[in-house]
Each structure stands twice: as structure tokens, then as C-alpha cells.
């Protein structure tokens, strides 16, 4: 009788994880990604869940990114492609208004973890 109770308790506690941690399967530190999104000024053009910023948006809102089938108009939506887009959007779409901001690989991974988990 004790085992089912302990198993139930373990399952309940497993669901009480850190909301800033990237979901299973994603690399990176989502909490650091939220900070990096603010530091790189992404909020100047985008509405981002959990990141305060401008009310004038040039780029698309960055909410529910994980539900989008594609990113940047052509890429299958996965973390690797999102990191590529964040780091060098001009290489993917030379006509994009999104600038190359010199985002490091580590920061792009963390930023993608935040975006794909919120």
C-alpha cells in the first residue's frame, strides 16, 4: 500500500518543477534566455511573454513559439533552426528586417529555450 502512495507523491512532486527550466528535450537555461532576450533588445521589436518592452512592434509576437510549424517563413520549427535564426537571420532571409545582433551560441540556445517553453 505504501508504494502506490509514494509513487503518487513522486509524480506530483515531479510536476512541481522550475517554470524557468527548459522542457525535456530542449537544451539551455530558459531563465537565462529570458534575461538575454531583454539584454539584446529583442523587446524593442517583439512582444515576448514575460519580457516587458515596447508597445510598437515591428516583428511578430514571440508567444507560443513551440506551436508554430515553421519559423522565419521557411524553416521547420525546432530548437536548432531557432538558434540559427537568432544568430544570423540575414543568412536565412536576406530581406528580413531582423538585424544580426552578434548573439553568442550559448545565449541563442538559452533564448530559444525560453521562447519554446513560453
What does each model-found stretch correspond to?
Residues 2-7:
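Sec-dependent signal peptide recognition
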Residues 12-15:
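C-terminal motif of bacterial Sec signal peptides marking the signal peptidase cleavage site
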Residues 17-38:
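Electrostatic cytochrome c docking/interface patches
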Residues 35, 53-118:
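Extracytoplasmic electron-transfer domains, predominantly the class I c-type cytochrome c fold
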Residues 42-45:
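Short cysteine clusters
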Residues 48-49:
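Beta->alpha turn/N-cap motifs
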Amino acid at each position: 500500500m505504501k508504494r502506490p502512495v509514494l509513487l503518487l507523491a513522486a509524480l506530483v512532486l515531479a510536476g512541481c518543477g522550475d517554470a524557468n527550466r527548459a522542457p525535456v528535450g530542449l537544451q539551455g537555461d530558459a531563465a537565462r534566455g529570458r534575461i538575454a532576450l531583454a539584454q539584446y533588445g529583442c523587446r524593442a521589436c517583439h512582444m515576448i511573454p514575460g519580457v516587458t518592452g515596447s508597445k510598437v512592434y515591428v516583428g511578430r509576437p514571440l508567444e507560443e513559439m513551440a506551436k508554430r510549424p515553421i519559423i522565419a517563413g521557411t524553416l521547420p520549427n525546432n530548437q536548432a533552426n531557432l538558434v540559427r535564426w537568432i544568430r544570423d537571420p540575414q543568412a536565412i532571409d536576406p530581406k528580413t528586417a531582423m538585424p544580426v545582433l552578434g548573439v553568442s551560441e550559448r545565449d541563442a540556445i538559452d533564448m530559444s529555450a525560453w521562447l519554446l517553453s513560453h
